[in-house]
Amino acid sequence: MARNKPLGRKLRLARALKSNRAIPVWVVIRTSRRIRFNLLRRHWRRSKLKV
């Protein structure tokens, strides 16, 4: 990908980067383990973003 990105694309990539993480431990505790993992986790090589 180009080094010089439009601002909109850069913001979308930043949002995807922040949302691509495990859920906090306190969420697992608070929901009594009903929510254990993030279903929307994305691996950089397996699935690509539609940006």
Swiss-Prot record:
Keyword Ribonucleoprotein tagged: yes
A Pfam family hit: Ribosomal_L39
GO terms for cellular component: ribonucleoprotein complex; ribosome
InterPro entries in the cross-refs: Ribosomal_eL39, Ribosomal_eL39_CS, Ribosomal_eL39_dom_sf
Keywords: Ribonucleoprotein, Ribosomal protein
GO molecular function: structural constituent of ribosome
SUPFAM superfamilies: Ribosomal protein L39e (SSF48662)
GO biological process, one term: translation
Keyword Mitochondrion in record: no
Family listed: Belongs to the eukaryotic ribosomal protein eL39 family.
Stored NCBIfam families: PRK01242.1
Protein's recorded name: Large ribosomal subunit protein eL39
